[in-house]
Amino acid sequence: MTNPNPITEVLDPVYLPELPPTQDELPYDDGEPMESWRHRCQMDLLISTTQTWLQQRPDGFVGGNMFLYYSLEQTSGRNFKGPDYFVVLGVPKGERKSWVIWEQGKGPDVVIELLAPSTAQEDKTSKKQLYEQIIRVPEYFWFDPFEPEDWAGFRLMGGRYEPIQEDAEGCLPSEVLGLCLVKWEGRFRDIEATWIRWATAAGELVPTEAELERQRAEQAEQRAGRLARKLQELGVDPDAL
């Protein structure tokens, strides 16, 4: 005979721990433009040269003017705008909406802030302290695109930032990247100015993607010229081929 009132076992509810938010769940755009067009160009110059440098590596990410999340408390209020430029090594390549340290597994290895009248004091004090004591960024630099004499670099040593001294060539070396940050007098996006960009330890500028394409085109033209001269020496008209 079937029991009309079967006894069912009542189980205690299981509460799963709340997982921290990911980059897809966090704000990644504050709608605020950079301080000036030159600031934007300087950021793009740094990013572009870093991207060509990263082509030689299987890992690495470079970003700029994007949110950097370093604590769960920070997610409750948008109280910190991300670095103007940063590099992270030892991580898979690929696009990110924002940099979420607990999702990616590590923070930036190098940060550069571009100074402006409205941000310089913060970049030199509270942000520097944040990068040093909370996020613990190994190397931190700042530069003023309109006052190029105002630049500095710091390296984390013993838990504190120590100034990076300019070398004999006037550059600030990055031990993390194995590159040097140099001042470059030149034209970028129709602006003639003093910029900062990366150079190799031998002093060769790391090219942007556009510069790299020009170099490739020039090399191809030189090869074609050598071939044409060789054919002419053999009595062959290269234009007739």
Feature-to-residue mapping (PLM):
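C-terminal interaction segment
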Residues: 2-33, 70-83, 90-110, 114-134, ...
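Acidic-basic catalytic patches of nuclease active cores, encompassing PD-(D/E)XK
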Residues: 36-81
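A structural signal for short, well-ordered beta-strand segments and their strand-loop junctions
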Residues: 61-63, 141-144
